[in-house]
Amino acid sequence: MELLTNGVGLSVVVFFPLISAFIITLIPKAQEQLIKGFALVSSLITFVLSAVLLFQFDFSSADKLQLGNKISWIKSINANYEIGIDGISLPLLVLSTFITVLAIIYSIEHLPEPKSPKGFLASLLVLETGMNGTFVALDLILFFVFFEIVLLPMYFMIGIWGDKTVRTVSGFKNQIETRLYASIKFFVFTLFGSAFKASSIACCIKKEFCIDLIN
């Protein structure tokens, strides 16, 4: 269990779903049961590892960051790969991994059209990496990267597997599927939000402000 106390375990919880998603892309599309089973097992492993962190965490010092790690990343702007958890982020991390397990269990038998478990489950696991990363990131640029990772699979999941109901939307000449409209709206709003975040980070770097979230 020593690996879980020096930041390695936390990194595994974050990146294991991403590695699993990559492996899923290598599995032939026709082997749906293998894809579903592999995705479920991967999510369960991630959940178990996050649950183990509950026993490694010192709740008497819940206000302090623990089980983290810091590695120099982009030296020119003093950005680091810095992660850690406290009494607030740990429950959210465990909840994130648990909900992912439930989502995969449900989607195995209720996968929306078009039924492509390979793409859907791989996207869901990439989404999990982004979610887990946002809860543990202690560097502003690292947080931004993980936040953007969340947005990419969400956009495709909404646009491909969303509601196919056709509706009339002001501004569109013809009727449009709800999922297409929702994905466009999602893209526009997140694009503006990401632009503002990126601009704010750039200003912090230019003014030589600290981009370490704990300082």
Regions found by a protein language model. Give the residues of each.
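N-terminal signal-anchor/start-transfer transmembrane helix
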Residues: V12-E32
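Transmembrane helix-loop-helix hairpins at membrane boundaries of multipass inner-membrane proteins
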Residues: M1-G9, I27-I108, P112-A122, I211-I214
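Alpha-helical multi-pass transmembrane bundles of energy-transducing inner-membrane proteins
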Residues: A30-E32, G119, S123-V126, G130-N215
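Membrane-embedded alpha-helical segments in integral membrane proteins
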Residues: M1-E2, S20-I24, S72-N80, L127-I141
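Hydrophobic transmembrane alpha-helices of multi-pass small-molecule transporters
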Residues: A21, F47-S50, I104, L152-F156
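Structural signature of hydrophobic alpha-helical transmembrane segments
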Residues: T5-F16, G87-S96, I141-P153
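Hydrophobic residues within membrane-embedded alpha-helical segments of Major Facilitator Superfamily
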Residues: F16, S20-I23, S42-T46, L92, ...
